[in-house]
Structure formats: structure tokens, C-alpha cells
Amino acid sequence: MAKKNKKDKEAKKARAELKNQKNQKKQEKKFQKNKNKSLNGEEDDESDQDLDEILSSFSKKQIELEHVDITSVEKPSCRTHPLMFANPQHNKHELFIFGGEFTDPETKLTHFYNDLYSYSIKNNSWKKYVSQNAPLPRSSAAVAVHPSGIALLHGGEFSSPKQSKFYHYSDTWLFDCVERKFTKLEFGGRDSSPSARSGHRIIAWKNYFILFGGFRDLGNGQTSYLNDLWCFDISTYKWTKLETNSKPDARSGHCFIPTDNSAILMGGYCKIIAKNNKNLMKGKILNDAWKLNLTPDPKKWQWEKLKNFKNQPSPRVGYSFNLWKQNKSVAFGGVYDLQETEESLESVFYNDLYMFHLELNKWSKLRIKPQRQTNSKNSPATSKRKSNKDQEKELQDLLNSILAKSNLNDDDDDNDDNSTTGPNSIDDDEDNEDDSDLDNQEDITISNQLPHPRFNAATCVVGDSLFIYSGVWELGEKDYPINSFYSIDLNKLDGVKVYWEDLSAIEEAKRLGDRDSDEDEFEYEDDEEDEDDGEEEQDAGPLEGDEDEESESDDDKQAQMEIPDERSWLPHPKPFETLRAFYLREGANFLTWSISNNRNLKGKQLKTKSFELCEDRWWERRDQVTLEEERLEDTGGIIERDTTTKPSKRR
């Protein structure tokens, strides 16, 4: 045993010596490289400029603009960490992208943006806005939109071209979604508004914008994570800092979503001192959940810690989280750091899609359904879609007759038979889409696969569609921006619309592999031995391969079980049945149930309640229906697919 220990020590000593030699060679190589730069006059480049000078130059150029410059463009330039948000105006079908950053892979210089883009979903067209009153260039800012048509922007970060110097903003801006105009808000003292930061989150609730968390750079490589809570009153245009008895730990990159009378906070990221090395700050991915109980008086707001939710995704950070409907949110992507040392970081990236039901406190994993094979305008599916109006009229006649028997018709129901509450709102735009709109979609392809794994994607929900723009993927120490744009119909889940996608750099990196990993082989070995000597490891999520094996075994187990039905008296969706088809089939039953439970309502209000109940039921049984769909696909069973919805184009 003693001989073995002695041999291990000698081997370890030899590896350490080899490591020192390699590090010395690296330092010599770096010194020679810097020396050559100095001799060639390259030492005084843009990266050494003072940040105040850079920002001052931007400001001067911006002031010279005499008017707003509006240009039609094919698409935004490639960038990461921008803001993307929907126009909150009803039926506007438009989204905005602001700011972001891009690091040139050849020069390694980083450029920050302050241009604004608008995207018309109906016309599939982009416009670029450049004006003198726009915020200075930045990335990783926070934004939220209010139903009144305004958006609130706060903070963000900026750096020198080689990212040797960083700057965090503390300014607050209002954006008018109608006029496409930014307005900077001024406040009194230093503590009258949130401090400079990035990585924070803002939500809108009633007449307030609510801000929590984030981080700021303190210089000398030090970072401060925040857990302060602020509210912005849109009636007074003032920030107020709120103090609570208990509150979540400081963090950035968290999820923050409003509900009717609360706000839900989940996850996030911070850095802590490593237990075995006080000089090393290790990243910590948080997996807790909190509820902020909201009242009309902000001074009475209080935090409440929540238990873990059912079917919760594995721990991760950098995943998007967007409010979809009043009681549902959707999450995409993210990253989990498996192992972090002073010189390396191993991570797993995700591209899964989840729905979180705010009332049930339950997660559901969403899956893309296989594409139908037809796209002809004269196909049976298209003919079936044309008869869909007849089905809707039959349903309306039936609903009105049920209301008439109970003497619950509105006075104007007879004149409004064609106004269907519910399913029309889902697909009317598609059924009424003219040929010119179809022509604008010619360059869009449909994929049966979710977008490539990534973190920090810019996302927003417009209507029932989730839009995904940009994102970051890593290999070794290199970041790869993903220049791409997608949308997913969250009701149908019948494919991913790919507007554009460039994965060439990522595919090349995967083909070549991480060259740095071969060079650092001995560092990894030493790090592993250090962990064996007693380092407490960070909780690790499953490796990608292990995760697949676990998910497969979990799926096998789920296939053998039934998910309990707490409201078995309500109709059950069929496999592969859309929400629209479910309502057309069972709308009368849902209306009857709504009448018995809403005695004070009439006519249209009862129709609205019946559709809301149908929608809740469709999502409530989504996990069970997904199991049934998977069983049918695995066994090759005959599937009754819904053909009332519009077939997707394949080009």
C-alpha cells in the first residue's frame, strides 16, 4: 500500500512539473506576443481608450442626427444579449429588438449597439430606427412592457472593445411603442432610482413596473450581486425602494413573472467563494422559488419562499421565461455548469421547451409534433379548413340554443352569431391570410426539431407564438453567437418556423473539437485529483448523454402509468387534438358546466368562461395526452390527426 501511495505521489509530482513547464511556455509565448505588438506600434489600440471618451464620442455622433432615420432592412445584424419585447397594443402583431453586442471572431473586438428594430409578423418585414434620443449602446439591460403601450428600460452594460474595462448603466428610459420614441427619465438624488447593474429583471403589474436583482462590476475583477426590490409608479414616474422582512438571495439571470396578485421568482446565478480556495469565486446556479405577494399598496409587499414545483426542469441559468397568457408562462434553453476550476468550465446547454402553469404551480414539457406532409392549397386538409367555418357556425348555433333555453342570451346575440369567443382568436388570422401574406412567408422553412441548444436567447411571446432570437453556445473558453430567428406556435406545436439560421461556426467548432482542451489535459487531471483530496463538489446536473438515458427510462416508466385526473367529469382531449378542435368538439359541454357555476353571467361572458375552462382543461391534461401520443407513435397505432388547422408550408 505504501509503495502504491509513493508511486501515486511521484506520478502526481511529475504531472505537476509538466504542468508548470507548460504554463511557463504559455507565459513566454504571451510575453513575446505582447513584445511584438509593442514593436509594431499596436500597443495603443482601441481597447486602451477610456470608457468615458468612447461614450462621449457616441453621444456627440448621436446629437448630430437631426431626425429619426428609418430604413427597411432584411434582418438585424448578428448580436447577443439584446432586448426583445412585443408591442403590447392589441392585435399589433409586432416586436422590437434593441441594443446588444457582437464580438468579431477575427479581431476579437466587441461592438455594442443602440439601434432599434421593429418586426412586422404579418408582413415578415424589418425596419431599423436610428435617432438622437436613443439610449447609449448597451447589452444585458432589462425591459418590461405595459398594456398602455409603453416599455420601461433600465441599466445594461458596456465595455471597451477588448472588454478589459466595463461600465454599468443606471439610467431609466421610457419607450413609446406607438411613436417609436425613447424618453430619458431624470431623478433627484443618488438613491432615488436603482443603482447601475445588468442581469436584472423587470415586470409590469397593474400601474407598476417591478425590478429585482442583477449584478454590477466593482473593478479589480470583483462583482457584486444584488437582491434589492424597486417599484416604478407609471402615474408619478418615480422609483421607490421597498424593504421586506425576508427576501431571496442576491442573484442575476433569474426568472420573474407576474400573476394576478403576485409575482413568481425562480432560479438565477451568483458567485460564491470556493470552500477549498478563498481566492477562487465559483459560480452557483440557484434553483429556489419565491412569491412576492402584491397589494395596491407597495409598502405592504412581502416575499414568501415556495416549495419546488412539480415536474420542474433540471437546474439551469440563462433560460428565457415569458408570460404567455394570464396564467401560463413558457421557458426555453439555458445552461448548467457541471465543473468549474480556475482555468476551465464544463457546461451542458439545453434547447428544451417548458410551460409553467401559474395557478397549478406545475411544469409541463412541450414537444414539437411531426409535420404533416401536404402543403397544397387544394389538399384535403385545406378543403377541411374551408369547412371549418361551417363547424364554428354549427357550434355557435348550439351554444346560442343552450343559452336561449336557460334565458341567458344577450340582447344582441342574434345579431352577433358569427362572433365566436375563443377558437376564432386562435386561428382567424391564418384563415383570413391572403395570398400576399403567403408570399411574404416564402423564405420561411419548417423544422421538426427545436432550435440548437443555447443560453441567453432573446425571446418574447406575441399572441400565441414564441419568438426566439440569437443566443450563445460555448465550446471550451470560446463563445459562439447564434445568428438565428425562429417562432413556435404554442397552441399547435406543429413545427418550428426558421426565418434564418447560421450554425456554420458551431458545426465547424464541433468538427474540430476544443483545441484548448487537449492543451489543458494535465490541468483537468490535477483538478480532478484536487477534488478527490476533499473538495466539496458543486451539485451537478446530468450530463447530456446521461440525461438522455434517464429521460428515456423516465419515459418508459411514465408510459406504464396514468396521470391522476382531478376533474374527471370534464371532457378529455384526444391525442394530437388542437385546442381549437377540442373546443369545437366539446364547447357545448363546457358551456353547460359554465352556466351551472356562473349564475350571474349571461351570453358572451358565459361563452368566454366556457372557452377559458376548455383551455385550462386542455393544458391540465397535456402531460397525459402527450403520453398517449407517444404510445401511439411507438406502437404505430392509427392516429386521428386534426386536419382543421392550416398545414405548414415546406420549401
Curated annotation (Swiss-Prot):
Kelch repeats span 94-148, 150-199, 208-259, 262-310, 334-383
Q: Which UniProt keywords apply?
A: Kelch repeat, Phosphoprotein, Repeat
Q: Which residues carry this modification: Phosphoserine?
A: S47
Keyword ATP-binding listed? The answer is no
Quote the biased-composition stretches of kind Acidic residues, using this chain's numbering: 41-50, 426-440, 516-555
Q: Report whether Repeat shows up as a keyword of the record.
A: yes
Q: Where is the signal peptide?
A: none
Give GO cellular component annotations, separated by semicolons: cytoplasm
Report the InterPro entries cross-referenced here: DUF4110, Kelch-typ_b-propeller, Kelch_2, Kelch_domain_protein
Q: Which Gene3D superfamilies match?
A: Kelch-type beta propeller (2.120.10.80)
**Cystine connections:** none
Residue ranges, annotated region (Disordered): 1-50, 369-392, 406-440, 511-572
Bias (Polar residues)? 371-382
Specify the superkingdom: Eukaryota
- Renumbered to this chain, the Basic and acidic residues biased-composition regions fall at 7-31, 556-572
Q: Anything else of interest in the record?
A: Present with 4010 molecules/cell in log phase SD medium.
| Protein name in UniProt | Kelch repeat-containing protein 3
Q: Species name for this entry?
A: Saccharomyces cerevisiae (strain ATCC 204508 / S288c)
